[in-house]
């Protein structure tokens, strides 16, 4: 395994990037396809560690699927119902939250005996709000080690009914409930306690459910009504749009050191909230052009930003890097859920930004970033977090080199990231 990657100073950014499929959409649509009536042909599926964990789990559950085109096309043979296993199994899901949470819910419908576990970091990521909600709906679940964290044993039994869910930590808990509630015996009312984070990710879920023939009643994200005893119907073919979070690095590179960059696979018609990253770049001064399925960013003088970024939590990490190249102190707010991602991203970003010379103030749910007077060469710890590696690659646009430790962590979502980044990089 490669210990580090040193990126030399890049003098200019220019080119076109064809985005891999969205991770958020890929794992959702794989699960929906497995539970739907009929065969679904998925194209532009993301080929990454996280999708492999989902596919491996579906195979172990008994779902038939066939991969082609370098694992980006997948024919999924749906079973037309929730999963019911005749024998106990264990599923290892690494650090893939988009597999762990929805699969736990899906396996909590019929009577089952399944243990879901992951790597060390997954066992530090809270899951109590989802477990509590499933128990309210009649499911039987047990923590196998620490209370509130995976691994978790589910024995099934979720029937629906009235459920109170804390929405303040992760939208994936709500996504998981929404996706399985139509298959429950009873109607389900989900009432949200607290402020729901990352609402655009819920919009992705609702959009996908609609594509598979299921609609729900959304009362301003305060409550959700889902009719029970429904069935998902395969749409036949489904094209996974490009990953908007992955687009952020290339758009940011153009804003900092363009030239221009065109990202193909997301645009005005995208269902992902992270496309609003381009709006933030525009507010900072970058020049943005939109198409139905592409975004173009051109360099311009960048100014500080002071924004609530709860709606783009993953792409907001890239804004923290862009802020290093802007005039003035930028403040990124309402990002507490960074702390329960692949690593504690607030703490990690704070430490690594200081290494390159930035003045950082870290709050419970915010980050203040003052650009360096001059950039310093640094070895960047990635904390086995793919987004840390991709974000800090942009430091090479500062006129100095940067060394990224454990660069292979990008395989979680974007194995070819560095290859693509170098394609649009120009060197003196």
Swiss-Prot record:
Phosphoenolpyruvate binds at residues 23, 97, 125, 172, 345, 387, 412. Signal peptide: none annotated. SUPFAM superfamilies: EPT/RTPC-like (SSF55205). 3-phosphoshikimate binds at residues 23-24, 28, 170-172, 198, 314, 337, 341. One of its GO terms (cellular component) is cytoplasm. Keywords: Amino-acid biosynthesis, Aromatic amino acid biosynthesis, Cytoplasm, Transferase. It comes from the Bacteria. The active site is at residue 314. It catalyses: 3-phosphoshikimate + phosphoenolpyruvate = 5-O-(1-carboxyvinyl)-3-phosphoshikimate + phosphate. GO terms for biological process: amino acid biosynthetic process; aromatic amino acid family biosynthetic process; chorismate biosynthetic process. Pathway: Metabolic intermediate biosynthesis; chorismate biosynthesis; chorismate from D-erythrose 4-phosphate and phosphoenolpyruvate: step 6/7. InterPro entries: Enolpyruvate_Tfrase_dom, Enolpyruvate_Tfrase_sf, EPSP_synthase, EPSP_synthase_CS, RNA3'P_cycl/enolpyr_Trfase_a/b. Its EC number is 2.5.1.19. It is an enzyme of class 2 (transferase). It is found in: Cytoplasm. One of its GO terms (molecular function) is 3-phosphoshikimate 1-carboxyvinyltransferase activity. Pfam families: EPSP_synthase. Monomer. Belongs to the EPSP synthase family. Catalyzes the transfer of the enolpyruvyl moiety of phosphoenolpyruvate (PEP) to the 5-hydroxyl of shikimate-3-phosphate (S3P) to produce enolpyruvyl shikimate-3-phosphate and inorganic phosphate. This is 3-phosphoshikimate 1-carboxyvinyltransferase. It comes from Buchnera aphidicola subsp. Schizaphis graminum (strain Sg). The gene is aroA.
